[in-house]
Amino acid sequence: MDPIALQAGYDLLGDGRPETLWLGIGTLLMLIGTFYFLVRGWGVTDKDAREYYAVTILVPGIASAAYLSMFFGIGLTEVTVGGEMLDIYYARYADWLFTTPLLLLDLALLAKVDRVTIGTLVGVDALMIVTGLIGALSHTAIARYSWWLFSTICMIVVLYFLATSLRSAAKERGPEVASTFNTLTALVLVLWTAYPILWIIGTEGAGVVGLGIETLLFMVLDVTAKVGFGFILLRSRAILGDTEAPEPSAGADVSAAD
């Protein structure tokens, strides 16, 4: 298919917005991820595994709805900054407000941490997203960068918790859980760190990259952080309820034989 014709079709559906191509692809990839997780989880009987599937399926499901809304221009507003009109997709922040706590919940379930720790993580995470949105909707550069800094500090706090408290808790659950947790945490550390960098160089910040490239990069980050995360998690034995069961020792076998 001619890519120019494909882009023209997306432009028509998206009221001439060039970024609609990437929003459409993002919608499709999120839907594929949701469907894959649903099919993979169908018939799973392990209680713990079903809990992980329930949480993880919601992540790309919510994201696909957000991307579809942005594709059709819903969740889009204009903000004037320094006399220049900027297109701001606040639907993206709505997506993150729901999906990032779910990703953290998956990690918290792996580590088996208490409710207070989970509540703290989710609360700081929500503050990170809300302050980022306030920054995106602010009309002065100083306000935008101040809120960006506030949001980034919140992100650092969340990542610190993951790399310290939760990592230690996951390590106590055995090598299978620790390995999966470390892999997922490394993925989160890399990808989540890229978000504020893209924000600051994108149209919401310094404007080094245009809205089309910015949308493409956010789409790649979102798909990897949601579908990629879920793919790694749900293929691991760490989600099964018997991961903590100790193997019988040789001495126990002898005693049983007696």
Swiss-Prot record:
Membrane topology: Multi-pass membrane protein
Predominant location: membrane
Stretches in topological domain Cytoplasmic: 41-49, 112-114, 171-173, 244-258
Propeptide segments, given as residue ranges: 1-6
GO molecular function terms noted in the UniProt entry: monoatomic ion channel activity; photoreceptor activity
Pfam name, any one: Bac_rhodopsin
Transmembrane segments: 19-40, 50-71, 90-111, 115-137, 142-170, 174-202, 211-243
Keyword annotations of the record: Cell membrane, Chromophore, Hydrogen ion transport, Ion transport, Membrane, Photoreceptor protein, Pyrrolidone carboxylic acid, Receptor, Retinal protein, Sensory transduction, Transmembrane, Transmembrane helix, Transport
PROSITE patterns xrefs: BACTERIAL_OPSIN_1, BACTERIAL_OPSIN_RET
Modified residues (Pyrrolidone carboxylic acid): 7
Residue spans, topological domain Extracellular: 7-18, 72-89, 138-141, 203-210
InterPro entries xrefs: Arc/bac/fun_rhodopsins, Rhodopsin_retinal_BS
Function: Light-driven proton pump.
Stored PANTHER family: BACTERIORHODOPSIN _OPSIN, NOPA (EUROFUNG), PTHR28286
Designated name of the protein: Archaerhodopsin-3
Organism, scientific name: Halorubrum sodomense
Gene name linked to the record: aop3
